[in-house]
Design a protein with these regions (language model features):
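All-alpha RGS (Regulator of G-protein Signaling) helical domain and cognate RGS-like helical scaffolds
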Residues: 2-18, 31-33, 46-232
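Twin-arginine (Tat) signal peptide motif
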Residues: 21-25
Length: 232
């Protein structure tokens, strides 16, 4: 784990001010402020700023994995925001409340990574949801299920690629929230179907960054360059 110097301490103070603007109830409440500040201090290094010469370069090492997570959180946050621009026909008050909570969680995740990465963060992606039917319950919930499952499998598949124990702890806490989202969406579609997200060994699905980005590419107009991400 990197040692903290005076520069890092300054970053911690600045990060605390930035993160106060995020939703503590929805995010910092379950990941812990101290870990969040450590993430900010270690990640905000100008030398790690991704290049855009060959598409949106996620970067390398832990910064690359954090940008990978940030890209996925951008998709999820934008999707749930779009859901509430014109809620599907027949949405109940209970569904609206719970989906609204998920939206707020995803926005908090997105803004957390953006603030934590600082100058190393990738750009805001241009997304394309034209293939999604936002007007029907089935269209929204089936897509929500797909996105939540993708997010869970992404965090599960990338955890071992992180060198920092602090980052790994954060990823584990975030994926637990994503898994709860996935379970709730499944229960909306078919009560009691939460186990559908497990593999034959009873474990949650896992995908590599390349596998995840191949699926996510359908909704991203930007070219994503993941060539510098760690693979082991």
């Amino acid at each position: 784990m990197p040692t903290q110097n005076s520069h890092d301490n300054g970053l911690l103070a600045a990060a605390e001010d930035n993160i106060k603007n995020l939703s503590r109830r929805n995010f910092l409440g379950y990941i812990g402020g101290a870990s969040a500040l450590l993430l900010t201090a270690a990640a905000c290094k100008k030398s790690d700023t991704p290049s855009t010469s060959k598409g949106v370069d996620l970067g390398s090492k832990d910064t690359g994995i954090l940008n990978y997570a940030y890209a996925l959180e951008q998709i999820e946050a934008a999707f749930y925001t779009k859901v509430f621009e014109s809620p599907y026909a027949g949405i109940t008050a209970a569904e609206s409340a719970r989906l609204g909570d998920i939206r707020d969680h995803e926005i908090s995740h997105r803004e957390f990574f953006k603030n934590a990465l600082g100058t190393s963060a990738i750009i805001s992606l241009t997304l394309d949801f034209s293939t999604i039917n936002f007007g029907t319950r089935d269209g929204v919930l089936s897509t929500a299920k797909a996105f939540e499952d993708l997010g869970v499998s992404a965090y599960n598949g990338a955890g071992h690629l992180l060198a920092s124990a602090d980052y790994l702890l954060l990823a584990g806490k975030i994926v637990s929230v994503e898994a709860r989202h996935a379970a709730y969406i499944r229960d909306l579609i078919a009560p009691g179907s939460f186990a559908d997200g497990l593999d034959m060994n009873g474990l949650e699905m896992s995908r590599t960054p390349i596998e995840v980005l191949a699926i996510a590419a359908s909704y991203i107009k930007n070219k994503i360059n993941a060539s510098n991400l760690p693979t082991s």
